[in-house]
Amino acid sequence: MAQFEWVHAAWLALAIVLEIVANVFLKFSDGFRRKIFGLLSLAAVLAAFSALSQAVKGIDLSVVYALWGGFGIAATLAAGWILFGQRLNRKGWIGLVLLLAGMIMVKLA
């Protein structure tokens, strides 16, 4: 694997942002009834995976995937709260904390 460079972290950050955008567009698509948002969601997912493919050139796949998934979930929760008024219950918060702890453990392993 190539030596870590910040450009790979930037690709990972872009992949995370695009995943969040895809999830928000998916919500706006209302089950693909609003086709433009559904298509935008699909385009964002494709772009996210393209960015992810660049990130794994300089960061281990296991680390990239854990960070992408974890930050994507956490940020999507935040977007759901801000944009749609969705809230987590106690079990949801515990799950989020466990998710973040798992991401840290994968990074430190």
Curated annotation (Swiss-Prot):
One of its GO terms (biological process) is glycine betaine transport. It is found in: Cell inner membrane. Gene3D superfamilies: 1.10.3730.20. It comes from the Bacteria. Residues 27-35, 85-87 are cytoplasmic. It is a multi-pass membrane protein. The chain crosses the membrane at residues 6-26, 36-56, 64-84, 88-108. The keyword Aminoacyl-tRNA synthetase does not apply. It holds the Pfam family Multi_Drug_Res. One of its GO terms (molecular function) is amino-acid betaine transmembrane transporter activity. Residues 1-5, 57-63, 109 are periplasmic. Forms a complex with MdtJ. Catalyzes the excretion of spermidine. This is Spermidine export protein MdtI. It comes from Shigella flexneri. The gene is mdtI.
